[in-house]
Amino acid sequence: MLRAKHIGKNYSSSLSPVLSPEHKPSLLESQAIGTVATAQANFMRVIVQDVANSVTSDDDNDSSKTGVELLCVVRAVLKKIRRRVLVGDKVLVGSIDWVDRRGMIENVFHRRSEILDPPVANVDHLLVLFSLDQPKLEPFTLTRFLVEAESTRIPLTLALNKTELISEEELETWKIRLRGWNYEPLFCSVGTKDGLDDIAFVLRDQTSVIVGPSGVGKSSLINVLRSNHGGGVVEDENWFEPMLGNKWFDDQRVGEVSSRSGRGKHTTRNVSLLPVSEGGYLADTPGFNQPSLLKVTKHSLAHCFPEIRNMIESEKCGFRDCLHIGEPGCVVKGDWERYPYYLQLLDEIRIREEFQLRTFGTKREDDVRYKVGDMGVKHAEPRLMPKKHRRESRKKTKQTMISELDEFEDEDSDLYIENDPIVQAIENENKRQ
């Protein structure tokens, strides 16, 4: 009984709130702290960064454990409380088999940043990459990606690839147009290697995510930045011990733009965090055509447009919750290029919020609940869905069984009476009379 109680306490303590980045838990020999490098299906590849003191007491053991790549699964209780593990997360790994390089993710450290499209954690910088042609640059699609990037509050850089496919006049037109959007884009060409120095300087010593539609050259840019442009990965920088078949030191697969649709083909299937020779990491992400904008609300949308931010910086609107659609005292006028895009996105978000309000209401419960245990110590446990994880009470189960047995006995007795020859003879005699 005491052993079961002790196990229960350990189970609850492991469900404590997300670990603080400054906090270093005491590690066992079968535990380690690492970073999630890639996620595919139900498996995570984690790069070990810190191990227990008993393991690192020997220099040989230290070098053999730090930098090892582990193939991990996520603890089931984390899935129950919807504590999602993302690429880029700093995690606590337990139950490690150092021979087979396998383990289980037990907890997640607090994230300093997070993005949804694509799902990556602890991002320092966003590189929004589009192509000027093949596929052709569409202003509304570009606006949608920029709004999604602005909503994360993470520093971003806009880069336009494939400059060799358009004329100088078109290039100058896009420069002037994007400056009107309050952006200073970087122009580059992966094919001719033009403009890559500026991009490499911006991405240096940071964890950066490259986002954009399929076919704009994200994987090609990563291949150039990791190999040809940077001169290759130096031998001393190979402190990782990757597994066979991973993507850490291989070129990313690239594909051609479809000649029929004019759009790119999906060659990258999952998010991967890749080291760069000049320092930092790059996240290669699957291309998608439309960001979801799930974290953008009707009130936060305006702050995702630099034009509106500049208008309301010096003079405020008459109402705090102004949506800038012609309200009295609104300082935002409709004489700027992307105002129709703002109205279109605002209508989309308002329809989504009204649907969510009708469907889910306003009450939302946390995925974790806390109970006060011995000595007033709080323990966390998952808040499970009542109809999915809760079992029925024994009293209700017994009542259901009794009622089912009664119905069965009634049916059985009726069947027995119908087949009884004496009863049938009496019924026939009554019919003759």
From Swiss-Prot:
From the UniProt record, list the coiled-coil ranges. Answer: none
Give the matching Pfam families: RsgA_GTPase
Question: What Gene Ontology cellular-component terms does the record carry?
Answer: mitochondrion
Obligatory cofactor(s): Zn(2+)
One GO molecular function term of this record is: rRNA binding
Coarsely, its chief localization is mitochondrion
- EC no. given is 3.6.1.-
| Residue ranges of every copy of the CP-type G domain listed in the record | 113-291
Q: Which parts of the sequence bind GTP?
A: 212-220
Q: What class of enzyme is it?
A: hydrolase
The processes (GO biological process) annotated in the record are:
chloroplast organization; ribosome biogenesis
> What is the free-text note on the cofactor?
Binds 1 zinc ion per subunit.
Localization, per the record, is: Mitochondrion
Keyword vocabulary terms for this entry:
GTP-binding, Hydrolase, Metal-binding, Mitochondrion, Nucleotide-binding, Ribosome biogenesis, RNA-binding, rRNA-binding, Transit peptide, Zinc
Where would you find the membrane-spanning parts of this chain? none
Q: What happens when the gene is disrupted?
A: Embryo defective.
Matching entries from SUPFAM superfamilies are given as: Nucleic acid-binding proteins, P-loop containing nucleoside triphosphate hydrolases
Q: Which domain of life is it from?
A: Eukaryota
Sequence segments annotated as region (Disordered): 1-20
Description of how the protein assembles with itself and partners = Monomer. Associates with 30S ribosomal subunit, binds 16S rRNA.
The record's function comment reads:
One of several proteins that assist in the late maturation steps of the functional core of the 30S ribosomal subunit. Helps release RbfA from mature subunits. May play a role in the assembly of ribosomal proteins into the subunit. Circularly permuted GTPase that catalyzes slow GTP hydrolysis, GTPase activity is stimulated by the 30S ribosomal subunit. Required for embryo development.
Know the name of this protein? Small ribosomal subunit biogenesis GTPase RsgA 1, mitochondrial
Tell me which species this is from: Arabidopsis thaliana (Mouse-ear cress)
- Gene name of the encoded protein: rsgA
